[in-house]
A protein has these predicted regions:
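Glycine/Thr-rich phosphate-binding loops of Rossmann-like dinucleotide-binding domains
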Residues: 31, 87, 151, 213-215
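Rossmann-like adenosine-cofactor binding region
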Residues: 186-217
Length: 217
């Protein structure tokens, strides 16, 4: 089983435990924090399991998931850039939030199926608890990728009275995402330089890859 798993990933490793979890992305081995976090939890709870970063090329993603479905020792894990959207079609099921925003960041094995979830939505909402955002406060969201979709969905659902600005490098992508929304108090910026023209932003949310490990743009 170890050999076959390594045939689908770029960073080869040896499984130290029978049960294992993965963080799946293009290069999570380059500084992903999830393995360090979860492996400390497993150790403290005396759970014989370990999480590994799995660097996967897009052409091997489908076969990797196919393999993991058959391997009962795989308990689940995380999904990171750039596969939060692409991985959905290979899973057995996804939860309601994932369907809504078309993005998965967590996989769990349940009843011999791999089910996708999105914890970005609720996690982001929880992170805003410490901020006292008033109705008159303006919000700027940068990015419309996997995490960005979750952020945008939460902002649109919970801050309907606030003025909202959105920017994404791919203008067509964010317009497609927002086309069904009520455009009242909603503004989409075409160019990054347009941000400097806004004077009333109270909260800026970075949902881009800038600042993610060694990712710089």
């Amino acid at each position: 089983m170890k050999f076959f798993l390594n045939s689908y990933i770029e960073n080869k490793f040896q499984l130290d435990h029978k049960k294992y979890a993965l963080i799946i992305g293009s290069n999570p081995s380059d500084g992903a924090r999830s393995p360090k976090l979860w492996n400390k939890v497993y150790k403290k709870k005396k759970i014989r399991c370990k999480m590994y970063p799995a660097d996967v090329k897009l052409k091997k993603l489908k076969n990797l998931i196919k393999y993991l479905k058959k391997d009962n020792n795989f308990i689940g894990g995380s999904v990171t850039i750039p596969y939060k959207e692409k991985i959905i079609k290979y899973l057995d099921e996804v939860d309601i939030t994932s369907k809504k925003i078309n993005s998965v960041n967590t996989i769990m094995r349940k009843n011999n199926k791999l089910i996708g979830f999105n914890t970005d939505y609720l996690g982001f909402g929880k992170s805003l608890d410490r901020f006292k955002i008033k109705k008159q406060d303006s919000i700027l969201v940068l990015g419309a990728g996997g995490a960005g979709k979750a952020v945008i969905s939460f902002i649109l659902s919970n801050f309907k009275e606030n003025k909202k600005y959105f920017f994404n490098r791919n203008y067509k992508k964010i317009m497609k995402l927002l086309k069904k929304c009520n455009y009242k108090k909603l503004f989409v910026l075409k160019e990054y330089k347009d941000i400097y023209e806004i004077k009333d932003i109270k909260l800026i949310i970075n949902a881009t890859s800038i600042g993610f490990n060694t990712w710089f743009e």
